[in-house]
Amino acid sequence: MKRKLSRRELFKNVGAAGAVTLLNVPLGAQQGGNGRQSSPFQQILDHSSKELLAEHEQYLVKIQTAKLIATFDRRYGSLSSIRRKNDELGTNYIGNETNTPGVNPSDSRWTGDVVSTVWRLLGDWRAAKIGLHDIFKMSGEWRRELSGQSGDIRHVEFRDNLFQVRYDGQSANEHGIRSYRLEMSFHPAEDHSLLWDIEIENVTPGVLEVGELGFPLMVNDDYAELYYEPGGQSAISTINNVDFVRTPLRQKLIHEQKVIVHHFIGGHSSYALVQRPLGDAPFLLLHPTNQDTSFECSYKDQDSAFSEHAEGWRGPDILAIHSRATKIRRGWTRNPWVNGHTSVVLQPGEKKNYQMRFVFVDSYEAIREELYQAGNLGIRVLPSMVVQEDTEVLVELQSKSEIDKISFLSDNIKVASRKRSGDKTLLNLSFRKRGQKSIKLHYGDGRWTNLHFYCIEDIETLLKARGKFIVEREFYDNPEDPYHRHHGFLPFDHRVGSAYTDSEEVWEVGDSDEAGFSEPLFLAEKNLYFPREEEVDVLETYVNDCLFKYIQNPTTFEVRASLYWKERLPSSPWGNWTKERSEATWRTYNYVHPANIYHALYRIGKRYGLLKRRKAEDYLRMSYHTCIAWFHAGPWKHIGMMEGSNAIHILEDIKREGWQQEYETLLQEMKECDDVFVSDPYPYSSELIIDQTAHEQVYFFTRYFGDQEKNRKTVQVLKALRGGNQPAWFRYGNDKRGDVCCWYNASLNGMALLSAFEDSGDQDAFLKGYAGVMSVMRNVLPDGMGFNYFICTPGVFSSDPPTTFESGTGLWGFLKSAKSYILNDKTFGLVGCGCRVETTGQAITVIPKDGLRKRMRFTEEKLDLECTQGEFKKVIFDRADGSLELQLEDSTGNVKSAAITLRGLEKGEYKLSYGNSSKRSPSDGTLVVNVAMSEARRVRIEPLRATKS
């Protein structure tokens, strides 16, 4: 029988044995798979994660329903755990001092605590003088009152399945509760959910302004806990996370025993979705239920000592009903958060009652139903919340009553249509002029919910502007640069309006790493769709004078860490790399970017003939050798890389060129990598403790090699990263990565989810994928400046820092993913996503507006159109006879011949008509059409004899 191990024993026992295994056991044995050697590590990994985390806790009492088990800690009056009943893994969704070691209970922020700030009156506030000659004097000052510092007045009772906590009297502690009586209870509801009731009563003799009233939601999300050992080294450095003996175990524990929480904070329809990163339903939902409970802001409590000794964990999120005092105390007055900040004023003896509800839901779609049943709004937005000017966005609002009023909180908002259909209000919105576009929905006798969109300019124009900006503002021309960055690319700082050459993190300005490859990566891929001779010339100059001369060794194909370096001082931080450190070539991630740059140049040469320094085949061979170096370099060679999926396209182009030996060699390297993905239960690790980078490559490799089960599991994990489609532009379709939004993972993982949708028809995967891909375009300004990401933290809420940094990877993902989708929606009928759709009888006219106008999918027919040379201006598809009319154009002036590929056709013979020519062509389901651009204004494709493929 397997011996049970505690969490700390687990890592202690791996210890030295793990280190020996890392050094001496072949990769396959470390990572798993058939024939793996038995080791102390493997014996531990073979335990179920439930056994591994079995802990005994005291002071606990329990409430059970048919669906959940909740335990409460009498010492703190807090919720200690929520588990699904009969859950095979036994995961605790709530954070406590066992799964979040190092917290300080004397200043607690448990789930069940209350965080408040009240206005301490020192005089008559109504007598304030604010006239012309008056001297204004504040009537008092803010004072924090915290249940976590009110243990001296805390009373806890448990009886009859009711857990009650009362704070009665005045706490003697500095930040204890004194101004109000607080009473809370947790009890099961008839529907097997858990209700949390809160009542506050003003016990002062005067009016009481509560400027902050927030509820910590402490969940079991301290991932860093798995990387620390008492008495051992203080931390496992995130940039040296190469302990592959422990990595599968850590990933197993993270995905099965830790949770991820997604928040929608927008009024009465707010919610928190807590789920395992594994992505398996049911999920734990927390949401408001009554008239007075509406969340307006969410933030960390920076004043708390609760988490200061919990290494790597920033503390729980505070879900705030009122946050005016928080705004003032933290200096957000010039940068308030999206919903505004309010106070509540209580007269002496006046009470307020709040209620929240914990319930397990069986699907993401079920979230909307739970909110609807609570009298709030079930919200669905199609297709995204980052929206181009003058394109429609569709909003479905499921509610028990009609929406009373829609208030515009921003300029240039248009409601094109509004109608009530059953229990749903359907809106068709559009926007003009860049910026956040917010609406407030009023309903249900005083309830409200805010929706925040973001309007951007025409994407095609933005992409072309970005390419021009890179060439004109970021291409570095300095033959005297001592670091050999001449004809490389530098990042751009929007604050000073200039590229910059120095950074405390040398790789940021060193022409390698994600920051250094960002600009040429985007520029190369962009020119594959919109070729511009000047930009291609710059790319070839960059390769010749910088990349394939100084960054990459042209003989060994090794890629160095940075061209830039610094002489270290006693006070130098880690990022001040020495010359020796900058010359290191072991970071696997640095190989994928140049491989993709070379590959794009190969395709540019093949399609447009714009190359001057090398032949197209030369670039493909450089890409191939860089891929081989990638799969042999450094410790992360068999971990998913950002943009790693493109190895599949490189491989296919090598095959088309007839390079059989190179094809077989690269195929074998990729297959070995995929074997690790399949054998490792959770192959989603990286150089960081927790990351969203590996998933894209894992998804596409397992799909390519036919590993259906791991591919399905990866889709499930990808969807968990995005949660319940939280309807705010900075969360919709975005992976939960703290408060970082619209980053590269939004588009790269979105690309995978869109592929999953095309394979399966999963509408939820479509929404998560499409919205994520669109979100990165918010980062590009009309002049071509491109931010790296957006920070949605209250008080920040901007692109911080406002630099380009790694922006190119996210835009690369957009370019790979952009497509016009024509689909039948269950609510809105025929919908164009990334395009405008018009119908006449059985004929569908599509005018693409997806940014590229290169790809199109009729989802019901599973018909794909791709124009690799030229652009679709208009497409007419007649469902009655299966004919297609393609109207093409070239916005670049560099396309000599239009190239179109159709996939998903019925087998048979087709008549092609264009210009003054026509011909017949057989199709096995795929049809390739090449037409001189001068004759491509109108191409007609008609089936003559067709059979179902």
Predicted regions and their residues:
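Carbohydrate-binding surface patches
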Residues: 808, 812-908, 926-940
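Acidic-aromatic substrate-binding/catalytic surfaces of carbohydrate-active enzymes
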Residues: 40-41, 56-173, 226, 232-241, ...
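Short Pro-Gly-centered flexible turn/kink motifs
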Residues: 67, 344-362, 935-942
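C-terminal beta-strand-rich structural cap/linker in extracellular carbohydrate-active enzymes
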Residues: 363-365, 922-949
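Low-complexity, Pro/Ser/Thr- and charge-rich linker/hinge segments at domain boundaries
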Residues: 222-228, 369-391, 448-491
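Catalytic cores of extracellular degradative/oxidative enzymes
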Residues: 470-754
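N-terminal export signals
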Residues: 9-30
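Acidic (Asp/Glu-rich), glycine- and aromatic
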Residues: 75, 176-180, 189-269, 447, ...
